[in-house]
Amino acid sequence: MSEIQSLTERALADVAAAQTPDQLEALRVALLGKSGSITAQLKQLGTLPADQRKAAGEAINLLRDALTAALAERKNTLETAALDARLAGERIDVTLPGRRSERGGLHPVTRTLERIVEIFARLGYELSDGPEIEDDWHNFEALNFPPHHPARAMHDTFYFGDGRLLRTHTSGVQVRYMDAHKPPLHMIAAGKVYRSDSDQTHSPMFHQLEGLLVDEHSTFADLKGTLSEFVRAFFERDFEMRFRPSYFPFVEPGAEVDIAWQQPDGSTRWLEVLGCGMVHPNVLRNVGIDPERYTGFAFGLGVERFAMLRYGVNDLRAFFENDVRFLRQFA
């Protein structure tokens, strides 16, 4: 019995000292396996005197049960410790600042265009769209451009080999709209246009918005009132405005609109912001509208021009350089 007691003490001490699951498994095999020391004790019960077998058997069974429980407890302890160590290594430091999501924003030209469209929508104008690759009829001929007009020259217009071209204005959308609708008409067209020009105030691609109204009793006074209301709504203040006579093939009379713009030094100067005029009778005839019954007015403006004025940008090219430092100001 003393041998069993000694074996119990050694075995429990070895179990408690095991540091890894592999060590613990090797110890289990050495104690409880087919060739283990506890199994050997059970096999020796037959050699004991009959009066000692029962007590020895009970002692060995108690030892086996104690070792089984100790092994299970130690295994659970080692597995828990291993899991804690792994979790500690993978732990997320909640005190570490998160990665900030970059906040996006609309491009200033897009902001400006949407603002202009919204203003004219409140005035009852319908937004229409058309192709950027146009034919000569919709871009020039239907709009009363004579064959010798400078705008048709290669240095002003991007032509394709088949005679088509990149539209130089959105006026072609007006022609298509008048072909598809009957008066009265109230529409605007906005989008990219292309001209062979590039400097501090010009870009080979820019955005334009044009408007058209055709009705039986439209006058230049209606045009003036419409544009005055638009300028006031866009800049959110009143301006002194003047309408200078000017020439555009598709309107007669035509005018350019200037506003009294305040300079940084406090002085004011006249600043051109858009062109306009009464729709030329030839344009109405080209789309099947009787100029004896209907009159109309049209206007056009450069969106980048208004964006430069609204946001105080001096160089048009800044809108197209994709400099994040510049664009972030509008996010």
From Swiss-Prot:
<dbReference type="InterPro" id="IPR022911">
    <property type="entry name" value="Phe_tRNA_ligase_alpha1_bac"/>
</dbReference>
<keyword id="KW-0648">Protein biosynthesis</keyword>
<dbReference type="InterPro" id="IPR004188">
    <property type="entry name" value="Phe-tRNA_ligase_II_N"/>
</dbReference>
<dbReference type="GO" id="GO:0000287">
    <property type="term" value="F:magnesium ion binding"/>
</dbReference>
<comment type="similarity">
    <text>Belongs to the class-II aminoacyl-tRNA synthetase family. Phe-tRNA synthetase alpha subunit type 1 subfamily.</text>
</comment>
<protein>
    <recommendedName>
        <fullName>Phenylalanine--tRNA ligase alpha subunit</fullName>
        <ecNumber>6.1.1.20</ecNumber>
    </recommendedName>
</protein>
<keyword id="KW-0547">Nucleotide-binding</keyword>
<dbReference type="InterPro" id="IPR002319">
    <property type="entry name" value="Phenylalanyl-tRNA_Synthase"/>
</dbReference>
<dbReference type="InterPro" id="IPR045864">
    <property type="entry name" value="aa-tRNA-synth_II/BPL/LPL"/>
</dbReference>
<dbReference type="GO" id="GO:0000049">
    <property type="term" value="F:tRNA binding"/>
</dbReference>
<dbReference type="InterPro" id="IPR010978">
    <property type="entry name" value="tRNA-bd_arm"/>
</dbReference>
<keyword id="KW-0460">Magnesium</keyword>
<comment type="subunit">
    <text>Tetramer of two alpha and two beta subunits.</text>
</comment>
<dbReference type="Pfam" id="PF01409">
    <property type="entry name" value="tRNA-synt_2d"/>
</dbReference>
<keyword id="KW-0963">Cytoplasm</keyword>
<keyword id="KW-0479">Metal-binding</keyword>
<dbReference type="Pfam" id="PF02912">
    <property type="entry name" value="Phe_tRNA-synt_N"/>
</dbReference>
<keyword id="KW-0436">Ligase</keyword>
<dbReference type="GO" id="GO:0004826">
    <property type="term" value="F:phenylalanine-tRNA ligase activity"/>
</dbReference>
<dbReference type="InterPro" id="IPR006195">
    <property type="entry name" value="aa-tRNA-synth_II"/>
</dbReference>
<keyword id="KW-0067">ATP-binding</keyword>
<dbReference type="GO" id="GO:0006432">
    <property type="term" value="P:phenylalanyl-tRNA aminoacylation"/>
</dbReference>
<dbReference type="GO" id="GO:0005524">
    <property type="term" value="F:ATP binding"/>
</dbReference>
<dbReference type="GO" id="GO:0005737">
    <property type="term" value="C:cytoplasm"/>
</dbReference>
<keyword id="KW-0030">Aminoacyl-tRNA synthetase</keyword>
<feature type="binding site">
    <location>
        <position position="252"/>
    </location>
    <ligand>
        <name>Mg(2+)</name>
    </ligand>
</feature>
